[in-house]
Amino acid sequence: QVNSGGRNIYYYTHVLMADGLHTDAYIDYVLGFYDKCVNKTDLSAVSAAVEPDETTDAEQTLAYMDIHDSVDQLTWGNLNPQIYYKPTPRIREINENTATLTMDYRIASLTDSGETELYNVHESYRVRYTDSRIYLLNLERTTDQIFNPENSVLQDNGINLGITDKDVEFVTDEENRVTAFVQENELWTYRRLDGTLTKVFGFPQKENMDYRDFYDAHSIHILRVGREGDVWFAVAGYMNRGLHEGENGVAVYYYEAASSTVNEEIFLSSMESAEFLKRDVDSLAYISQDGSRFCVLLEGNVYQIDLNSRTYEVLVSDVAEDCHAASQSGRYFAWLPQGDAGDSTALNVLDLETGATQEITCGADERIRPVAYMKEDLVYGVARAEDIDVSHGGNGIFPMYRLTIRDGEGNTVKEYEPAGAYVTEVEQSDNMLTLTRVVKNGDVFAEGTEDHI
């Protein structure tokens, strides 16, 4: 415990005292495997460790690799990486027989035109110790290119982000003049009229790098983009630098394009872990049209913060897990006030811009739940109570005989009620819903065909 600035700061660590954990052997193994891949040496050892199968090199991308990829893919293919920042292994789990370790590091590579490109790499290893050797049980590697506007990134059909996850967060203004996007936890804007790229926010520094540049326990959430390039955004999780360095919380910022300044509007300190904070803000974060109010889901409550008076109120309390959904903009928030995803007869929808709440109900012998949002339209499902079986927790079944798509004004956009089929799961991808369906044979449900909306 340390007292700083009139407050107590608590530090903790977990010390494991045990014999025969083979810690040195595990660390040597993962560092050795990483070194062989980067330097393309001892390829026979890499080959002996991996497990190619029918999925080998299926994606043909360096953005994601695993134990089932080829030796060529795992040793970076045509890329000739150089170590830019060395890894430090972290032990996540360990016992006498197995261990899970992760590593984060940065590599550099030259393009054919002589440009230097930097990549952040995250690796996760699952290994097993035997007296004769160490076995690689699982390996996953993700690679994300660090955006550099000085390289040839502007193309006729858009911005080339290089090797990275396909799921990139971006928001445009209403006239599509300015686009804000997040790449490797850095926020950028792109002005279409003149092709200007501007870095708005990011903890990493170009010079005097240290571990704070690589500690990835926060996320950036774009809230709104104005037509002149102004951006409202939130940062959730652990604060690597700045006034709140070392704290967990949610910071709301306003970027004014005309002056190229970033102002902190408010910081909400939290005792939640960085992982939970990121999850909460992913679930709901909204800034009002006039920029005076910020709404966010934190620790099971929906808060509205007045950014002028620095006061807050709780709009919704005790929001249960798996009992809520928010629209793409965050303006609409749907939740089950009864707090039971398998036994609720009412669904509320709150318009965070106007403060108005709508209630959607089902019959007494039916149950309702929010499924997803398609942009600003709510998708909810209704099941017959007699068909529901949630006695096995996550393995239960909630067979919805009807799905309804409803806009923010409360108008029904579409109803989906297939004859003889029930929807049990919904997966959203862009503007399409993939429906997992079952059919009923007597009192038993059997696997059915997939459908789409």
Annotate the PLM regions.
Residues 98-136, 140, 145-146:
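Exposed beta-sheet edge and beta->alpha loop/turn motif
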